[in-house]
């Protein structure tokens, strides 16, 4: 039998490491279809830390795509599971027949679905990608992204699946002991990536709350981002007093990041697409409500799980935030579908579908 090959076709270290470690620690022991990987990027100790996996690394998108296409042509029974598909050459291969629909299964990460880049080459590529997406064997995504995708590709099969956020289920019932009164602390964005639109988000927070709240902006990832970090810092200082603005330029380890999140009262995410699900999960777990752009379809997943959702277009004040905190405290977090370990069932089903084990 030909085993399923998983493809991480772009060098996105943080997300790629999360996926590899999840497969190594959780899925590989029980499924032979959870062990073979082709990855763009450097080893950086991943092979040693993921002994249950067979991982082949490639220096760039082009070399990986060529290897995938060669395997696909050599054996039409070979199936591939693409995790976050940011590799144009692979889309073109699907469109041209180099990879067949029955070989192509795609877990949507959010940024790979939306057409937000305004550059000429992207505008030329997006129509071709849309045509290729009609040929995908099956897509796996959040409820909101499935709904978004189905509007333009109603005939493509879609299955619910959540990114494997690193979570400790024992923290679901831990009461957040932060004082829910006085000056609020607001987390702005989930990383230093420009897609967070930090400057616009800071202006929106200031418009809602003025200089009465403390704003925390985590920007330690991605690396080599100093110029943009300084741009955000200066924009923040034009709006907030120095004691009310904390721009973090160093990457935080997981436990330190968790501690930071638990010091917040509200998460504020202005981006108009699904992203940052890991940060959203950790905030919700800590009883901290989130403000989303109404164009971000993840609100559908949150309401499906009976979670309070605030929108950037709402008139926000402290009373509304405190009420959302109270509502969130009443939710049984052990039942939330996109929390660990509840998302495991979706992953087991996704593997079976992509491998052809179930119809």
Curated annotation (Swiss-Prot):
GO molecular function, one term: fucosyltransferase activity
Role, per record: Catalyzes the synthesis of Und-PP-GlcNAc-ManNAcA-Fuc4NAc (Lipid III), the third lipid-linked intermediate involved in ECA synthesis.
A GO-annotated cellular component: plasma membrane
Catalytic reaction list: beta-D-ManNAcA-(1->4)-alpha-D-GlcNAc-di-trans,octa-cis-undecaprenyl diphosphate + dTDP-4-acetamido-4,6-dideoxy-alpha-D-galactose = alpha-D-FucNAc4-(1->4)-beta-D-ManNAcA-(1->4)-D-GlcNAc-undecaprenyl diphosphate + dTDP + H(+)
UniProt GO BP: enterobacterial common antigen biosynthetic process; fucosylation
Matches recorded under HAMAP family: WecF_RffT
Domain of life: Bacteria
Keyword entries, A-Z: Cell inner membrane, Cell membrane, Glycosyltransferase, Membrane, Transferase
Compartment annotation: Cell inner membrane
Designated name of the protein: TDP-N-acetylfucosamine:lipid II N-acetylfucosaminyltransferase
EC number(s) reported in the record: 2.4.1.325
Positions of transmembrane segments: none
Keyword ATP-binding attributed: no
Pathway: Bacterial outer membrane biogenesis; enterobacterial common antigen biosynthesis
Stated family: Belongs to the glycosyltransferase 56 family.
Pfam family, one: Glyco_transf_56
InterPro entries registered for this protein in UniProt: WecF
Membrane topology category: Peripheral membrane protein
């Amino acid at each position: 039998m030909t085993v399923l090959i998983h493809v991480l076709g772009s060098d996105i270290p943080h997300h790629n490491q999360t996926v590899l470690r999840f497969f190594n620690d959780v899925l590989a022991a029980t499924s032979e279809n959870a062990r073979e990987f082709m990855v763009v990027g450097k080893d950086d100790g991943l092979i040693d830390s993921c002994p249950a996996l067979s991982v082949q690394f490639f220096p760039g998108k082009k070399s990986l795509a060529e290897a995938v296409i060669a395997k696909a042509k050599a054996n039409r029974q070979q199936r591939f599971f693409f995790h976050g598909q940011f590799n144009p050459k692979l889309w073109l291969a699907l469109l041209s027949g180099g990879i067949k629909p029955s070989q192509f299964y795609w877990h949507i990460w959010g940024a790979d679905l939306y057409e937000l880049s305004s550059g000429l080459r992207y505008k030329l590529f997006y129509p071709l990608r849309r045509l290729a997406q009609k040929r995908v064997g099956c897509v796996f995504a959040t409820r909101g992204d499935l709904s978004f995708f189905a509007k333009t590709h109603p005939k493509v099969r879609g299955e619910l699946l959540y990114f494997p956020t690193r979570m400790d289920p024992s923290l679901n019932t831990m009461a957040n002991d932060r004082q829910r009164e006085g000056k609020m602390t607001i987390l702005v964005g989930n990383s230093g990536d420009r897609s967070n639109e930090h400057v616009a988000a800071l202006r929106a927070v200031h418009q809602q709350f003025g200089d009465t709240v403390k704003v925390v902006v985590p920007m330690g990832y991605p690396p080599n981002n100093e110029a943009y970090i300084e741009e955000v810092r200066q924009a923040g200082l034009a709006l907030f007093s120095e004691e009310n603005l904390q721009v973090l330029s160093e990457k935080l380890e997981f436990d330190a990041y968790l501690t930071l999140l638990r010091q917040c009262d509200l998460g504020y995410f202005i981006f108009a697409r699904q992203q940052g699900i890991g940060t959203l999960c950790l905030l919700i777990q800590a009883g901290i409500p989130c403000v989303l752009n109404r164009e971000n379809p993840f609100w559908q997943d949150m309401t499906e799980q009976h979670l309070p959702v605030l929108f950037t277009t709402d008139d926000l004040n402290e009373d509304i935030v405190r009420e959302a905190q109270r509502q969130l405290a009443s939710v049984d977090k052990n039942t939330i579908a996109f929390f660990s370990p509840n998302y495991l069932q979706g992953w087991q089903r996704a593997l079976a579908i992509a491998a052809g084990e179930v119809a």
